[in-house]
Regions:
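Mixed-charge, low-complexity intrinsically disordered regions
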Residues: 2-89
Length: 89
C-alpha cells in the first residue's frame, strides 16, 4: 500500500474551518463536528465521525494542519486531503 505524498503549506486559519460533511480524497465521507484543543500539545484537532460502516469507534480526531494538507495520491493527482461537501441537514 503506497502512502500519499504530502505538500506542507501554511496552516489554515482555524476561523476558516466549517463544521459539516467532508469527502476524503480516497472517497469516504465524514461529518466534522468542530475543533478541539489537544491537551498535551495544545494543537488544534478536528473532531469528526465517519459516515460509513466499519468496526470500531466511529468518532476520531485529526490535527487541523493534517486535515488541511494537500496530498498526491498513487495516480499522481494532487488534491486536498478533505473537501467540504456541505452542511448536514
Amino acid at each position: 500500500m503506497s502512502h500519499p505524498t504530502i505538500a506542507h503549506g501554511p496552516m489554515t486559519n482555524p476561523n476558516d474551518f466549517r463544521p459539516g460533511v467532508y469527502r476524503h480524497y480516497k472517497g469516504n465521507h465524514y461529518l466534522a463536528l468542530g475543533l478541539a484543543r489537544e491537551d498535551e500539545t495544545e494543537e488544534l484537532v478536528v473532531v469528526y465521525v465517519r459516515l460509513y460502516e466499519r468496526a470500531g469507534v466511529p468518532m476520531s480526531t485529526r490535527r487541523l494542519k493534517v486535515w488541511n494538507e494537500i496530498v498526491t495520491d498513487a495516480n499522481g493527482t494532487t488534491q486536498p486531503r478533505f473537501v467540504f461537501v456541505g452542511h448536514q441537514t
